[in-house]
A protein has these predicted regions:
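Flexible "cap/lid" loop of the alpha/beta hydrolase fold
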Residues: 100-135, 173-182
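Gly/Ala-rich beta-loop-alpha elbow adjacent to hydrolase catalytic centers
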Residues: 83-88, 92
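Conserved alpha/beta-hydrolase "acid-adjacent" motif
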Residues: 209-215
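Active-site glycine-rich loops that stabilize anionic/oxyanionic intermediates
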Residues: 13-16, 206
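Catalytic active-site module of serine/aspartate enzymes centered on a nucleophile-bearing elbow/loop
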Residues: 227-271
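Conserved alpha/beta-hydrolase
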Residues: 29-51
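Short beta-strand/loop motif that positions the catalytic acidic residue
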Residues: 196, 202-204, 208
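Helix-rich cap/lid subdomain of alpha/beta-hydrolase
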Residues: 121-168, 172
Length: 271
């Protein structure tokens, strides 16, 4: 039987940086885990630095980001638990499909090719960037961030979260996610029937405007060859760090630790 994973890799989402995991990482470290929260390539700087010079986002796409994380995971001595939020949850699915990881958790995960749902709230949340097809990157203003990330909170509370965590996002990543179903060779795609991948937990938040529960539930149902679970937390928005986050964090870790295994398809490149 495989040893229980001792490492957790946290992958942030669009319009965020590893800072968004600061409380989760601290909690998991207090439980004895080695916690890595690497940035998307080029986004290693602090939130303030990226906001001052977002040109570091130019050229980022899904394949570049996933390859980056696969390299990090491949340098570990054993497969970790991989957790991703939003696009990070989409990347988690791709990494598991490649044979990386002992278990995966997607929090409000971005959908992959084959999931046809495109709720109007998702379109509205993404429109500040999608509406400008020639933009290489773009951020969310106070009202846009409130709608997308913190709609269960007051505007004032949302502004505090935005000031601490929000950065512009690379437009190409968003386009590859939203339009995956229209791309023949979409980077945001997996083999739903891959039986060698590790188990995965799909977590949805009932009030999420960016990735509402239904698309996540439909996505989880497409995985028929591996253990998966869908869990919905009521009254929560897209941002995973609002009050009560500890319940979500503990549920995610408990599930991953209980279901973790060494994927049969792990290759030397991912070990």
């Amino acid at each position: 039987m495989a040893e229980a994973p001792d490492t957790i890799v946290l992958i942030h989402g669009l319009w965020m940086t590893p800072r968004s995991w600061e409380h989760w990482a601290e909690r998991y470290r207090s439980k004895g885990y080695n916690v890595l929260a690497p940035a998307w390539p080029g986004m290693e700087g602090e939130v303030e630095a990226i906001n001052a010079d977002p040109s570091v986002l130019e050229g980022l796409d899904v394949e570049t980001i996933v390859d980056h994380y696969q390299g990090i995971i491949g340098d570990l001595s054993s497969p970790p638990i991989i957790m991703g939020h939003s696009f990070g949850g989409g990347f988690t699915q791709i990494l598991l499909d490649r044979g990386a990881g002992a278990a995966g958790v997607g929090l409000a995960p971005a959908t992959v090719k084959g999931v046809r749902d495109l709720p109007l709230s998702t379109v509205r949340a993404a429109s500040p960037l999608l509406a400008h097809p020639f933009k290489k990157y773009g951020g969310l203003d106070e009202k846009q961030f409130h709608y997308a990330f913190a709609n269960t909170l007051s505007q004032e509370e949302s502004d505090k979260i935005r000031d601490r965590y929000a950065v512009p996002g690379p437009a190409e990543v968003l386009r590859e996610g939203v339009f995956a179903n229209f791309m023949r060779h979409a980077a945001m795609s997996v083999d739903f029937e891959n039986a060698s991948r590790a188990p995965m937990l799909f977590i949805a938040f009932s009030e999420d405007h960016v990735v509402p529960p239904k698309p996540i539930q439909h996505m989880a149902e497409k995985y028929t060859a591996i253990p998966v679970e869908y869990k919905e937390f009521p009254g929560r928005p897209h941002f995973p760090g609002v009050a009560g986050w500890e319940e979500v964090a503990d549920y995610a870790l408990d599930w991953a630790a209980q279901h973790a295994r060494t994927p049969a398809g792990v290759s030397e490149q991912t070990r």
